[in-house]
Amino acid sequence: FGYGHRYVECLQDFYKLCGKTPLLPRYTFGNWWSRYHKYTETEYKELVERFEKEEVPFSVAVVDMDWHLVEDVPPVYGSGWTGYTWNKKFFPNPPEFMDWLHKHGYKITLNVHPADGVRAYEEAYPRVAEKMGIDPASKEPVLFDMTDPKFIETYFEELHHPMEEEGVDFWWLDWQQGTVTKVPGLDPLWMLNHYHYLDNKWKGTRPLTFSRYAGPGSHRYPVGFSGDTVITWESLQFQPYFTANASNIGYG
C-alpha cells in the first residue's frame, strides 16, 4: 500500500530487506521430466532413450515417491509415505541407474515426505538410531524433529549424504504435514527449506532445493513448486497466472 503502482521499486526494497534470490544452476532452466507413476529402472531408461530419439531435450529427471518402499512397508510401521530405502523391485541397482542418467545428461531429484522420521524397517535405521542414542534392537522409531540439532545433523549425514554420494543431485521436499513444531511459531517446512538449501552446498556446486512456499523469505531457497494440481485444461490455464503472481513476494 505504501508504493501505489511502483511495483518494481517495492520489490527492489523487499529484496534489500529480505535478501536476494540466489543464482540457480544452469540446468534448472531446461525441461524437467516429472510424472507420478511407478517407474521401473527399465521403463525410465526406455523413456529417456525415446526422448533422445525424438530429440526432446530434458535436463532434470524427477523420480516420484515410488523410488522407495511404499506398499511393501510392514503394516506395523504404518504407511509408506515416508521412506529412504530404495525399492529394489523397481530399481535393483540405484547407483548404476543414476550414473546412467548422469551420462545421458540428466540431473536427478528424488521425492521425499520426511514427516514420519526413520522407522526400523529402513536400511539406514541402525546407524540413525545409534547416532540418536536409541538401541536399534528396540525398533523404536526415530522421530522427525527439525528443532533438534542432533536430529538435523543425523538426518543429513546418515540419510541424505549417502544417497547424494550415489548420485542424487538435489531433493524434492514434498512437505504436507502442517506448520507446528516444538518451538511455537517455527514452521518445519521453513526449517527444511533453509537447511536443505545450505546443506546442498557441501559438494561445492551451486545449491538447489525443490520445495513448497513456507512464507515470506522463501525466495532465498529456490526453487519452488505450486503443489498438487488437477489434470484439467482450466487448471493448466491457471498455472501461469498463479506462478507469475508468486513473484509479487519474490518467490518462484
Question: Predicted regions: what is each one?
Answer:
Residues 1-252:
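Catalytic-domain carbohydrate-binding cleft regions of carbohydrate-active enzymes
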